[in-house]
UniProtKB/Swiss-Prot annotation:
It comes from Acetoanaerobium sticklandii (strain ATCC 12662 / DSM 519 / JCM 1433 / CCUG 9281 / NCIMB 10654 / HF). InterPro entries: Cbl-dep_enz_cat, Cobalamin-bd, Cobalamin-bd_sf, KamE_N, KamE_N_sf, Lys-AminoMut_A, Lys-AminoMut_asu_sf, OraE-like. The modification N6-(pyridoxal phosphate)lysine is found at residue 626. Heterotetramer of 2 alpha (OraS) and 2 beta (OraE) subunits. Residues 602-739 form the B12-binding domain. Changing residue 615 to G: Loss of corrinoid-binding ability. This is D-ornithine 4,5-aminomutase subunit beta. It holds the Pfam family OAM_dimer.
Amino acid sequence: MEKDLQLRVNEKLDVENILKDLDKYTPKRRGWTWRQPAENLQMGPFIYKDASTPLENSVALPSAKYFGDIDPQPLPVITTEIASGRFEDDIRRMRMAAWHGADHIMVIRTAGQSHYDGLIEGTPQGIGGVPITRKQVRAQRKALDLIEEEVGRPINYHSYVSGVAGPDIAVMFAEEGVNGAHQDPQYNVLYRNINMIRSFIDACESKTIMAWADMAQIDGAHNANATAREAWKVMPELMVQHALNSIFSLKVGMKKSNICLSTVPPTAPPAPSMYLDLPYAVALREMFEGYRMRAQMNTKYMEASTREATVTHVLNLLISKLTRADIQSTITPDEGRNVPWHIYNIEACDTAKQALIGMDGLMDMVQLKREGVLGDTVRELKERAVLFMEEIIEAGGYFNAVEQGFFVDSGYYPERNGDGIARQINGGIGAGTVFERDEDYMAPVTAHFGYNNVKQYDEALVSEPSKLIDGCTLEVPEKIVYIDELDENDNVNVRMEETKEFRHSSMIKPEVEWQADGTVLLTMFLPTSKRVAEFAAIEFAKKMNLEEVEVINREVMQEAEGTRIELKGRVPFSIDINSLVIPPEPEILSEDEIREDIEKTPLKIVAATVGEDEHSVGLREVIDIKHGGIEKYGVEVHYLGTSVPVEKLVDAAIELKADAILASTIISHDDIHYKNMKRIHELAVEKGIRDKIMIGCGGTQVTPEVAVKQGVDAGFGRGSKGIHVATFLVKKRREMREGK
């Protein structure tokens, strides 16, 4: 990799640089990569049973700060879907996702690309996805080559090999180093109405190419779940669809270990989802032993609440843990209300990492109870699926079954309601475009399915036909015809010209999806009904000078008492970060300097949690030697306990001739924490000791600047440690001695 393209942790990824010399780029590797198990991994104080090799660079979970900032990685590959319509902005999001543990980046195609009869070129903007083109794929794979070096783990790049141009896309993906793809002819037939004969013939070619490139294949059975009227009734059919594509792929020549079943828990609360979904997950994994499981998250039963979606997805993760998942796919919790935003891709990755690591070693302690309802339901599901397959055979095969509307029927098989999706064998897009090859047909290319009369030219090259032309594009990338742009207006260069100010200056704007899109999210509670709250919220946002305001979530707290509203809008301005007045980070003294100062002049403090407050953990961590508190530096601490009246704390300071008062206050109702701080200061003034004593106050809801306004010397907020308090005590005492 060129030196000037190496990423630096504290520098933004240069998308403009990525786009340079794409005509000369070739992928550094092919094939899918699985995570490497790290048996009995020791990280911090813990040993992990189901973890993989850690990353070299990553962003740990927020609570990792309590455990030495460790960032253990679960064993399943973690998927995130990134496709905003502008691939150039997605590259930046891919870097963020990789730092949060994603190693499978899936790019959804723009709406309608399934029906394009050939490849498209250039970089047009997409709708509901990204136009998949050679330039776009090459740029993103090139960026991922850099990103995977930065984080220290291979990243799998993935899109879709389906639609009318499936084989064309498969060849391009193999040429460009794409590592995985969806490929399932049933998707074409049922959901895109592409002729079934054409779809299966094309699938033979596509799967052969994917097998050559060692791509992982994900099937399309999960679409039946998303399409069905009542998803929990489609489980037998899901198993049939998995079976058809899996055995078909195996027969074409794919490795079993690269064939992944796209399985999704069919339901979500308030349905009894574990009771319904777990037996299905168990049955599927038992029937398809040896195949890979790509565990998807439920999208059918999602509304606009990100909290609700996250809980559903954690339940999905529990099923993955109780059964098996080789790839754990994630769904952004905002998918029910908008095209996914940057932050929600990251939230989804963190949800998967947090849940799976939290359940590390779980199966060493629990096992599924096979006697009773679980075992009975598993057997029943298998029986229903087998009967479904037998009926397909009786009907004359898959094509006839599709014509008769067997699939995505709302009945729970063997019940049928007659409302399934029906397609005609000789109908659909691409009908009549399949022809038998002539006897002298020959294609001098690698990974070509079916009859190929190479023998007529060179019998020795039957298994290596591309040698007839000194290699095809799969072996000789220089033969690839690279097309840059076709549309002079709808392309990445025009879009990036519009936003270059935000890459080449100190100007900044909020964004959620595209660079400098200006979108912000507001959450508010309004004490009124849902309908009134929605329009009141819009008016509030307009008075805040937001533009293009749209309510994206409404949740009733109580019909009369109030509604939670979430809305988005655009800020019509940017700011210059060079004009910001940013106070310097507080200086922290070295431990040696603190100890030396206190050894020369001993320091005594009194400490307590004040008011009617029983919280003590935070204050004890700041004080106790075992937590790295101020005792370790030689500070003499007199701890008075919790719920201590402020008068008692000040009196104790006088009685003990203390140098400082430390007060902890967690409860913040009606600003009682700040009122207590002000009262401590006032009492110290009244009793004539304020100029002789230091006062520091802290708590999770404390803002240091606001605390100082109450008259105390320092405030300590969330995340403050003993060394921060010790630094304050030493520095403040020096100032007092010097009369500052």
